[in-house]
Amino acid sequence: MTVAVAQAGPRAVQAPPVIPVLADVWAALAGVPDPEIPVISIVELGIVRDVAWDGCRLVVKVTPTYSGCPATEMINTLIREALAAIGIADVAVVNQLSPAWSTDWIAPEARVRLKAYGIAPPHVMGGRIDVSGISPLRRAHVVVPCPRCDSTNTQLLSQFGSTACKAQYRCSDCLEPFDYFKPH
């Protein structure tokens, strides 16, 4: 926290702490990468739902991508560290489970970077409920273009890729394996 000290005679007087504006808070959070997909930030991923001051305490509401996401604690720690770096020591990170996170909340520019990183971005669901990732028996045929060569000649290898929120695919044209960020 930034504290200004003014000299007024023989005693120093401390000015009240300077509270960062919310735009600075959002900018700091936009610099926090997702631990499992470091090419996009937690803001671009759409998991930071709200930021508000409650007196001198900053409250950050976060909706995890999955309620059991193993990166949740790491994300909370990274949030606190990023905000401490701009002088905010009193931070409450609140996990907000409702409404559930949707891949529709991923920013368009983040989808472009996912593809460049080698992860096929999820289809935009537009509010539809998709159960295709829940059970292989319910899985509808989903065309997942290869993020490397854009071929649609791809096949599902495993419902789970490098993380639970991704499936493993392989391109039949360039023969490269790749992750697909499952929509939900």
Predicted regions and their residues:
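Domain-level signature for proteins that mediate thiol-based redox and metal-cofactor handling
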Residues: 1-184
